[in-house]
């Protein structure tokens, strides 16, 4: 995500020199020169006094071409348009940006499903990446409900008083602080010039806006704030993490989760679009509907997610695409607010935007990432872990505060060679060479240029006591997304009903109350 997160022991893995940096980003509105670059799961958010009034001009699209009018092209018939699928490389940044992948290529699934997320309060913006995981099939009058997967630490930026319980209050069930309440939400995507023109017809006669003829990052404000559909908090049965520890012939019980509730860095947001609203209709037509089509072609809900033995991930190539917050440079950018909406004036918006990025590097241009195979040299307690896999439950100070409630990281992650994406990329889906999602990107280990992702389904782990499935559930997972999907009759649940495969049908026999609180009572 893209802001500096609050004071975590998240950064240090015991005595090792490994520092995990959460890939999110935050900008303060009042002090735009103080941007938290890539956050280190140490959130530092300088809050201005709430009494300060930030100028809020009447809403107009923030249009940021590279900014001078261009003279007419003389021999236009011989102009050859650059191949937008190749992208560009910027000085000082090794990854490929500003591209639209060709159909049927390895990065196309990530492009089709993924979006730039922006959360705004009265004094700051937070950025992350999200992707379409589900939607409601049932036709609703002038409504469409989409579900976007992202990281838990990205979803932490949503403080919506009208959210589902218990997410409408903090983790101690207290009201959110006024300055933390989310006031606006935008969905963005890097799109081709033709779609840019379709979304900005009212500006077609403004000749100086030459970026209407360019591929661009377009961010559109929604008419309503999202709600929280699912958080991977208190998601695992932890009884098996109690051990007898013998010291001087005395037996002590060691409970790894004695002082904190488990979490995985995964969440799902519900976004209801009002199709009678022009901006929401634009989001549906240009962002969500194409994603639905791509999702179905990728194998739909039951074919989209991989489910491997932990020692098999090392054989795969992993493709990452997300929207880190980077210097704008030659990136055309449109910010389309709701009609009549007064939004803060972001002075820094001409310097940094969410730029589409993939793990192709300037020095070799070999697509994708392989897993680290010698993590024992950098991480303690990794002796028995499969190559490239990290067992988060071994690192007791790897904790996170979601809505002011502390949780301890659990589950398994992938350690990716040379994949240290900056803030704003948190929440990006990681695809394998078979175009299946295996995990969700959430952090970087900058000292080694490693990226880290959270495995979503670990049901075939040979250590059966540590199985989990954040999507479809299993006997060791007490809180998973399919519970919400069943309760709300979503597309993913309808897909489950059509399957006879037991790996997807656990929710049908699960008697767990789906509206359970994620907070320990």
From Swiss-Prot:
Lipidation positions, renumbered (N-palmitoyl cysteine): 23
Signal peptide: 1-22
Covalently lipidated residues, kind S-diacylglycerol cysteine: 23
Keyword Membrane belongs to the record: yes
PROSITE patterns, alphabetized: PROKAR_LIPOPROTEIN
UniProt-listed SUPFAM superfamilies: Trypsin-like serine proteases (SSF50494)
Claim: Glycoprotein is one of the keywords in the record: no
GO cellular component: plasma membrane
Domain of life assignment: Bacteria
Keywords: Cell membrane, Lipoprotein, Membrane, Palmitate, Signal
Cellular compartment(s): Cell membrane
Topology in the lipid bilayer: Lipid-anchor
A Pfam short name: Mycop_pep_DUF31
Family designation: Belongs to the MG067/MG068/MG395 family.
Protein name: Uncharacterized lipoprotein MPN_592
Organism: Mycoplasma pneumoniae (strain ATCC 29342 / M129 / Subtype 1)
């Amino acid at each position: 995500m893209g802001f500096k997160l609050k004071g975590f022991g998240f950064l240090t893995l015991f005595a090792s020199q490994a520092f995990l940096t959460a890939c999110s980003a935050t900008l303060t509105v009042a002090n735009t020169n103080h941007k938290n670059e890539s956050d280190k799961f140490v959130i530092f958010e300088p809050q201005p006094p709430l009494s300060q009034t930030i100028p809020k001009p009447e809403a107009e699209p923030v249009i940021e071409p590279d900014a001078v009018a261009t003279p007419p092209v003389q021999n236009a018939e011989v102009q050859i348009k650059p191949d937008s699928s190749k992208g560009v490389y910027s000085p000082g940044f090794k990854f490929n940006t500003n591209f639209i992948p060709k159909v049927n290529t390895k990065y196309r699934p990530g492009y089709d499903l993924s979006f730039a997320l922006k959360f705004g309060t009265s004094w700051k913006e937070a950025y992350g990446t999200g992707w379409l995981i589900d939607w409601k099939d049932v036709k609703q009058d002038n409504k469409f409900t989409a579900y976007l997967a992202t990281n838990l630490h990205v979803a932490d930026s949503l403080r919506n008083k009208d959210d589902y319980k218990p997410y409408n209050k903090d983790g101690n069930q207290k009201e959110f602080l006024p300055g933390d309440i989310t006031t606006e939400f935008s969905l963005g995507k890097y799109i081709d010039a033709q779609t840019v023109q379709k979304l900005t017809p009212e500006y077609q006669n403004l000749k100086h806006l030459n970026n209407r003829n360019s591929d661009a990052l377009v961010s559109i404000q929604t008419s309503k704030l999202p709600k929280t559909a699912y958080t991977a908090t208190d998601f695992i049965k932890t009884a098996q993490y109690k051990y007898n520890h013998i010291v001087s012939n005395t037996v002590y019980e060691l409970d790894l989760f004695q002082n904190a509730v488990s979490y995985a860095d995964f969440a799902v947001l519900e976004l209801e679009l009002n199709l009678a609203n022009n901006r929401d209709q634009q989001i549906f037509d240009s962002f969500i509907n194409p994603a639905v089509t791509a999702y179905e072609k990728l194998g739909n809900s039951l074919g989209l997610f991989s489910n491997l033995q932990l020692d098999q991930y090392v054989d795969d190539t992993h493709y990452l695409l997300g929207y880190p917050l980077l210097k704008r440079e030659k990136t055309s950018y449109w910010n389309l607010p709701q009609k009549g909406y007064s939004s803060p004036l972001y002075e820094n918006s001409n310097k940094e935007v969410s730029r589409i990025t993939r793990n192709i590097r300037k020095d070799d241009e070999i697509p994708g990432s392989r897993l680290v195979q010698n993590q024992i040299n950098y991480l303690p307690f990794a002796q028995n872990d499969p190559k490239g896999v990290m067992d988060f439950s071994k690192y007791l100070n790897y904790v996170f505060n979601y809505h002011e409630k502390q949780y301890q990281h659990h589950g398994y992650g992938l350690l990716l060679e040379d994949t240290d994406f900056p803030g704003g990329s948190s929440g990006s889906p990681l695809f394998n060479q078979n175009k299946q999602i295996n995990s969700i990107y959430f952090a970087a280990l900058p000292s080694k240029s490693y990226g880290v992702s959270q495995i979503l389904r670990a049901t075939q782990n040979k250590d059966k006591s540590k199985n989990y499935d954040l999507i479809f559930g299993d006997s060791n997972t007490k809180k998973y997304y399919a519970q919400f999907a069943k309760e709300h009759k979503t597309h993913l649940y309808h897909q489950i009903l059509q399957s006879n495969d037991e790996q997807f049908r656990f929710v049908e026999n699960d008697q767990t109350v789906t509206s359970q609180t994620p907070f320990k009572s």
